[in-house]
Amino acid sequence: MKTYTENQIEEMRRISDETENLYSPYACRNAQACRQYYSKYDTEFVRSQFSVDADKIIHSPFFNRGSDKTQVFSFYKNDDITRRAAHVQLVSRIARTIGKVLRLNLDLIEAIAIGHDIGHTPFGHRGEFYLNEIYSANTGRFFNHNVHSIRVLQILSG
C-alpha cells in the first residue's frame, strides 16, 4: 500500500475540494456515497467511491459477458447492429458530456452509465416487457432492468 506524505495528502485534498466546489447544488457529492463495507484504506481524495464503483463494474464478469451481445436480435448478419460494449461506451460519453454541462459528479455518472445494462434480459426491452408482465402478475411488483443491474452487481457478484 502506497503511503503519501502530509504535503501530498494536503494537495490531493485541495484538488478534491476544488473539484467538488465546481459542482452544481444538485450534484451528488462524493461524501454522499453509501457503502455496505468501507475499507480502512479508502482515500476519497485519490479515487472517489464512484470511481471505484466504475472500475468494479468494468472488471465484473457480468460486464464482460455482455460485451459481445447485440442490442437487438436479427435473423441475418448485419454489421450495423450495435454491440452492448459500444452502446455502453456511447452512453457513458454522452452522459458525461451532459453531466459536465450541468456540473454534476462525472464519476457517479460514469458508474451509472457503464452499469445500466448489466441486468438486461435476453431480447432487450421486448424481453423486459414480457418478464415484467409475468413478474407483476405473480408478485404485484415490477421488473426494471436498471434496478436488476444493481441486484446483479450486489448479490450475484458477492
How should these model regions be labeled?
Residues K2-D42, H59-N64, Q89, R93, ...:
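Sequence-structural signature of the catalytic-core scaffold of metal-dependent phosphohydrolases
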Residues S51-V52, L102-G115:
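Alpha-helical scaffolds flanking conserved acidic
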Residues V72-K77, I114, E128, A137:
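A sequence-level detector of short, solvent-exposed, charge-rich linear segments
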